[in-house]
Amino acid sequence: MASTPSLIGLTYAGLAVLYLLVLPLLSLLYVDKRWTSGSAWEKVLMFFLVLFFFPGMVLLAPFMTFRPKPRSL
């Protein structure tokens, strides 16, 4: 059985991955999907998510592309 310090370390590592990678990725995908069609309160929620998960957004931003989809002519 693992000792208490290693369990504490694993817990901190799991929370760090959750805060720095998983939740910012989910919120970036949500913002990308709903930015043009969201209501005013939904945009307030989006701004809060970006502010709250800013360190993770800075880590993920170089790998994300939010270019507009090509239009059909």
From Swiss-Prot:
Record-level GO cellular component terms: plasma membrane-derived thylakoid membrane
Record keywords, A-Z: Membrane, NAD, NADP, Plastoquinone, Quinone, Thylakoid, Translocase, Transmembrane, Transmembrane helix, Transport
Top EC category: translocase
EC number: 7.1.1.-
Catalysed transformations (reactions): a plastoquinone + NADH + (n+1) H(+)(in) = a plastoquinol + NAD(+) + n H(+)(out); a plastoquinone + NADPH + (n+1) H(+)(in) = a plastoquinol + NADP(+) + n H(+)(out)
One function term, GO molecular function aspect: oxidoreductase activity, acting on NAD(P)H, quinone or similar compound as acceptor
Subcellular location: Cellular thylakoid membrane
Reported function: NDH-1 shuttles electrons from an unknown electron donor, via FMN and iron-sulfur (Fe-S) centers, to quinones in the respiratory and/or the photosynthetic chain. The immediate electron acceptor for the enzyme in this species is believed to be plastoquinone. Couples the redox reaction to proton translocation, and thus conserves the redox energy in a proton gradient. Cyanobacterial NDH-1 also plays a role in inorganic carbon-concentration.
Name assigned to this protein: NAD(P)H-quinone oxidoreductase subunit L
The gene coding this protein: ndhL
